[in-house]
Regions:
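Long, contiguous binding/interaction regions
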Residues: 2-43, 47-50, 54-76
């Protein structure tokens, strides 16, 4: 099975990478960019027998810092 894990910063957590991208877009002449939030995407190919609990554990233990990040899992 193929999964996509999308990791984003929680609301209220400062995003310096997003702010740098927003500033760079403005410097390149792109107007109207009001906010940018950066995140990560992981695409995993796992055995069909892999449980949802195992995927959740992968996310919590390695792929996302659950103190400051949220994650969601999409089946591809």
């Amino acid at each position: 099975m193929k999964l996509r894990i999308i990791v984003t910063l929680k609301n209220g957590v400062l995003d310096p990478q997003g702010k740098a991208i927003q500033h760079a877009l403005g410097g390149l002449g792109f107007e109207g960019v009001e906010d940018v939030r950066a995140g990560k995407i992981f695409e995993l190919e796992l055995a069909d027998s892999t449980s949802d609990a195992a995927v959740d554990e992968m996310c919590r233990k390695l792929l996302a810092n659950t103190v400051i990040e949220n994650y969601r899992v999409e089946k591809l």
